[in-house]
Amino acid sequence: MTATFPSLPQIDVARGARLPRVCIATWEIEGPSRNAGIGTAYTSLADALKRAGYDVTILFLLGCHPTDGNMIDWVDYYRTEKGMKLIPLPMAHEPRIHAAWASSVSYHTYVWLKEHQHDFDIIHFPECQGLGFYSLLAKRQGLAFTDTTFVVSAHGPTFWVKEGSQDYIRNLGELEIDFMERTSVAVADYLVSPSQYLLNWMQQNGWELPERTYVAPYVLPRTAQLAENGATRQKNNNEIREIVFFGRLEIRKGLKLFCDALDELCADRSGPKFEVTFLGKETQLYGRSSIGYISDRSKAWSVPWHIVSNKYQGPAIDYLRGAGRLAVISSLSDNYPNTVLECVGAGVPLLASNVGGIPEIIDAADREKVCFEPRPDILAQRIRNAIDHGAPSARPSTSFGDTERKWVNWHAGLSNRDKTVSPVRRPRDESRESIFPLVSVCFAYNVREKGTAATLASLKQQDYPHLEIILAECGSDDPSPSDSSSKSNGFKAHEVRRISRRSAELGAGRNAAAREAKGEYLFFIDDHCLLLASNAISVFVQVAQRVDADILTSAVSFYLGSSNGSSENRLEHSRRPFLGGDAATGAFVNCFGSTNALVRRDAFETVGGFSDEAVSTLDDWEFLSKAALMSLRIETMPEVYLWYREDQDRDSLVHSLVNGVRSARPYTTPGRKVSPAIELALSRVMQFGQGLKFERDANTGTPLSRGEQGPAVTG
């Protein structure tokens, strides 16, 4: 069922009111990014806000690596020509971030924005690539950005692009990005889409949308604007001599469809005379350059053609304004393409496919004469008619001036209005926990290993007021009964109990400690981990209650050390942020978190505890996978509260094959029942597996329909 979402609310701005400071955090922006839809949309918005007197900063999330030109020159251009700050995102080399590209950039973005959070009232992120993920999590969790409003714009998620491009999942990073995009949208203060179409697509594909979700068209670039008096628009251009494919040279934008239509037109030797231009950015198509693809297809054409791939938005529109040119936007799937918006704004004659949000751009009275069903025969006939009888320009469905004013005024009232609304958070069951619930620290360690003293010392300094500590001594030769004391070993007022076990398996030790625990929450910690902040457990509890998490993990800093060395000589060399409850990515890598986590007792019992098997260095991954597949809420904090020591004098078993295989067991358990959300995640796992096979087959030349087969076994 199709829903209708409201437009941006109309805001009246009081004269003399302080305008909020705006940051647009994006990996595409005009200049550093050429011919980029997201970049054009954000550039137009930034220009409109600047004209209205706003302080606007662009945080360029690709750092000092623009796809075009030199970053120093672009910074100077934005300062002198636009009066804006263009800041390339700093990405420190140390500590090294253990993460895929999108996660790493998102984490660097969070670190920078947290440091500058008081410089901005409003921060924009695109949903595509999910680069606002950690910043948005931190606000939801109450860790940062209390006075900042996050606006996420819906441009086109990764899997929506995959669907429209008829492409498969090519790498694990794309699974991560899908989860980051979905989470960023769900936790945003505001979600704004230029079209009703994309919001409905999201709902139909299992996305959770925030309560404050709106539709607002893009601001039209000034370079593409005409006066809005219809008399200034071309009635009909009766001398169409050049057909211009306008858009990125890719399948989703209709390149193959357009070439198929040209085949039909050129097959008719008595057909009209014309030439063809491809006006758009080169891409990869079927594993090769799209320019090479066009060159091969042109062998069937009897008309001259050429490619123009080096124009920015303004010069591209100027080219289309030339006499005798017809723009063709033949997209198979599209949201609210700037190509159509700019042609409508500039009065350029056009034909556009009737897919996605394209009809929402065009006035209802003009849609029939401009829009077409994306089929080669239909497009060929529409081009033939345009050459024979001329082609009209189209009117916009909404006033461009009204759209810009609405965006500008909405920002003016946004930050003050947002502070009057309570934070968006998941409702929790208040009856099942107190303000300061009892937390049971479950510390299982092998008595034959040295280095537990530093972990114990970090536990002693914790300021959480309602804490008990269970020490599970694994591998003990003297399994004496459990003992308890209220002030054991300098633990202040914390109750401490010890249990001894002959078995050395840490998973079994953690389970034994959990059975002894009395707390509403269980906090697991191992002997290589330190809680350096005295409020670490307090923060874990506060965040878990705020977001109603069943399991809460955090980023981990790794430092070099030795079992015999001083814990004071710490040198952080790397850091690992996690994703939380991403069941799809979790089938291939532990993206959930580490063993050192806060777990609600009833969630622990639902999962059934850790593995009791002898080699259990990856029992955290298996445990967290089970929890994710049971739809328990796993949340991760981007802030570092855990420091993990990597011993220089001990080999690690973390990457052992046996342990890695065990982590897949939750995904292959027969007869398990999962929620619709988990079914969707598992479908992504299947798509990724299929993509890996197709990629391998393409690289090795193996037919796509056949795998490797050995000789038949006959006896």
Protein language model features and the residues they cover:
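Nucleotide-activated donor-binding/catalytic signature segment of Leloir-type glycosyltransferases, i.e.
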Residues: G280, S290-Y319, S488-R497
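A recurrent flexible, glycine/aromatic-enriched loop bordering the glycosyltransferase active site
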Residues: G507, L579-V599
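Short aromatic/hydrophobic "clamp" motif used to bind/position activated sugar donors
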Residues: L522
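Acidic donor-binding loop at a coil-to-helix junction in glycosyltransferase catalytic cores
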Residues: S616-F623
